[in-house]
């Protein structure tokens, strides 16, 4: 299911991401802010486990997340979305997927996968700023499903309608959280209006 998150701060930071004059540092900070806000939405209704804690004065009821969270950034651009989330819990683990789509055609190349052990009781959150054709993300979800997590969600920043349609058709059970749904893909499969190549803008490369 597609879940576009509406928030004034997201719109403010998204404008910075789109602005071609933003420096890599400004791009990185805006990406971090939006990622945090989307993460709050992903985990808003996460199941909790009741525990007892001691305050300085007495015992009281408290809660902790029932399921572990595993982040899986799609390299490279997804790496910029990890740090804003891991600071919320020392128990968040991180896997990595190296997948890319060849610009000429729709062939997807999977070149790296490193996942934490025993994620069967985990909520996996895939991180990728751009959802363009959907072939890379659909491949990533299929790969992670082989590890049998309890739940898979996706945090992306900008998506094209074509990519949304492709991923929903392949994985209707996966929730996708977005900051924006853009107009279309151009002839080179870049999102329009988009924000350019997220990896290059994040790391200052070309």
Swiss-Prot record:
Protein name, entry field: Uracil phosphoribosyltransferase
NCBIfam families documented for this protein: PRK00129.1, upp
GO process annotations (BP): UMP salvage; uracil salvage
Activity control: Allosterically activated by GTP.
EC number of this enzyme: 2.4.2.9
InterPro entries according to UniProt: PRibTrfase_dom, PRTase-like, Upp_B, UPRTase/APRTase, Ura_phspho_trans
Binding site for uracil: 191, 196-198
Swiss-Prot/TrEMBL catalytic activity: UMP + diphosphate = 5-phospho-alpha-D-ribose 1-diphosphate + uracil
Binding site for 5-phospho-alpha-D-ribose 1-diphosphate: 76, 101, 128-136, 197
Keywords: Allosteric enzyme, Glycosyltransferase, GTP-binding, Magnesium, Nucleotide-binding, Transferase
Molecular function terms, GO-annotated: GTP binding; magnesium ion binding; uracil phosphoribosyltransferase activity
UniProt similarity note: Belongs to the UPRTase family.
Function comment: Catalyzes the conversion of uracil and 5-phospho-alpha-D-ribose 1-diphosphate (PRPP) to UMP and diphosphate.
Pathway participation: Pyrimidine metabolism; UMP biosynthesis via salvage pathway; UMP from uracil: step 1/1
Cofactor: Mg(2+)
CDD domains: PRTases_typeI
Cofactor remark from the record: Binds 1 Mg(2+) ion per subunit. The magnesium is bound as Mg-PRPP.
